[in-house]
């Protein structure tokens, strides 16, 4: 489909006002019971709760409180540079897809009708392919959700639906994904997305699931590696709400070296580990990192020397990437 992100570049020109509605309260014998019941049924709201963002953490804790105790996150041997990605134990990260995570979180809440979801799908389906929502329909859906098509929230939506590729949602993906999310209106979809984004900010394992999905989501049909251009666009998108240290340096390094043509899956996956565990000073090139990371670290060290005035960059032709491109790394192509 070419550069699929360009399908999402049309800005939604209108904002859809949202109508607030509050969760139904249940009769109880005490104020404490009323509070607990209200939290436990917070997912029953099909309208936007104006206090959803403030209460997201409380809702999540209440919904998961009755589940089997989760295993504590394993300690990392290296210092984590992105502290905001430290797991807080909300989820154990074992679910293979976002649909499984959402199902676990809301499985005891309201049921939604497949018939209702089918009608919602019909609003956005393509007139020439009634089993698909394609670019025009996605843009209208984004507009109704009050998001731009290239926003982080739409990537999260694609993850929630377990979409197989960019620029389209199949009927099965749309209906089954929203059914597992327990969302059957535009307002309830937006609430679920807002809650999920807050959970992603707090839970590292959950973010890892989204991060790994993003690689698959960006692949062209029958391809196994991302083009460098697509990889850079997706890195910028997936790290919208949580930007790791040296991220701008990483992007600068990739853009400055046109002989880097593609990014394989292993390099994509291990970059997240790299951002969590290492920095330029404690990086160990004897460990099993992709050679592209070795070159990046060498490049950054050379830049640091130049900026400190130790040698003149104009006379320095010893670009580490140019001098020792490793042929075994499929991410580097001359």
Curated annotation (Swiss-Prot):
One GO molecular-function entry: ubiquitin conjugating enzyme binding
Protein name: DCN1-like protein 3
Stretch list, region Disordered: 308-334
PROSITE patterns: DCUN1
Presence of keyword Cytoplasm: no
Stretches assigned to the DCUN1 domain: 112-301
UniProt KW keywords: Cell membrane, Membrane, Ubl conjugation pathway
Organism: Drosophila melanogaster
InterPro entries per UniProt: DCN-prot (IPR014764), DCN1-like_PONY (IPR042460), PONY_dom (IPR005176)
Basic and acidic residues: compositionally biased ranges: 325-334
Recorded phenotype for the gene knockout or disruption: Viable but with decreased survival. Mutant females produce less offspring with wild-type males. No gross morphological defects and no effect on locomotor behavior. Ubiquitous RNAi-mediated knockdown is not lethal.
GO biological process: negative regulation of cell growth; positive regulation of apoptotic process; positive regulation of protein neddylation; protein neddylation
Any one Gene Ontology cellular component term annotated for this protein: perinuclear region of cytoplasm
Function: Promotes neddylation of cullin components of SCF-type E3 ubiquitin ligase complexes and thus regulates SCF-type complex activity. Function promotes cell proliferation.
Gene name in the database record: SCCRO3
Compartments (UniProt record): Cell membrane
Gene3D superfamilies xref list: Cullin, PONY binding domain, EF-hand
């Amino acid at each position: 489909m070419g550069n699929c992100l360009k399908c999402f570049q049309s800005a939604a020109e209108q904002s859809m006002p949202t109508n607030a509605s509050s969760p139904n309260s249940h009769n109880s014998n005490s104020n404490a019971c009323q509070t607990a019941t209200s939290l436990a049924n917070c997912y029953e709201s099909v309208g936007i709760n104006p206090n959803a963002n403030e209460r997201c953490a409380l809702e999540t804790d209440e919904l998961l409180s009755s589940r089997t105790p989760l295993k504590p996150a394993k300690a990392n041997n290296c210092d984590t540079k992105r502290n905001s990605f430290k797991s807080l134990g909300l989820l154990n990260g074992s679910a293979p897809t976002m649909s499984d995570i959402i199902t676990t979180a809301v499985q005891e809440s309201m049921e939604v009708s497949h018939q209702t979801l089918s009608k919602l799908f019909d609003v956005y389906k393509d007139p020439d392919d009634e089993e698909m929502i394609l670019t025009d329909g996605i843009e209208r859906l984004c507009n109704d959700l009050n998001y731009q098509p290239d926003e982080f929230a739409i990537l999260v939506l694609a993850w929630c639906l377990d979409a197989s590729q960019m620029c389209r949602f199949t009927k099965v993906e749309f209906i089954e994904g929203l059914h597992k999310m327990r969302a059957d209106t535009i307002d309830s979809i937006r609430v679920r997305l807002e809650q999920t984004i807050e959970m992603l900010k707090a839970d590292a394992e959950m973010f890892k699931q989204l991060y790994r999905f993003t690689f698959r989501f960006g692949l062209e049909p029958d391809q196994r590696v991302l083009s460098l251009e697509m990889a850079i666009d997706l890195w910028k998108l997936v790290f919208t709400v949580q930007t790791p240290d040296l991220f701008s340096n990483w992007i600068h390094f990739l853009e400055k070296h046109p002989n880097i043509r593609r990014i394989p899956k292993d390099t994509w996956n291990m970059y997240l580990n790299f951002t969590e565990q290492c920095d330029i000073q404690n990086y160990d090139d004897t460990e099993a990192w992709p050679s592209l990371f070795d070159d990046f670290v060498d490049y950054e060290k050379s830049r640091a020397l130049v900026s400190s005035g130790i040698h003149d960059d104009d006379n320095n032709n010893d670009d580490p990437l140019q001098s020792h491109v490793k042929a075994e790394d499929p991410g580097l192509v001359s």
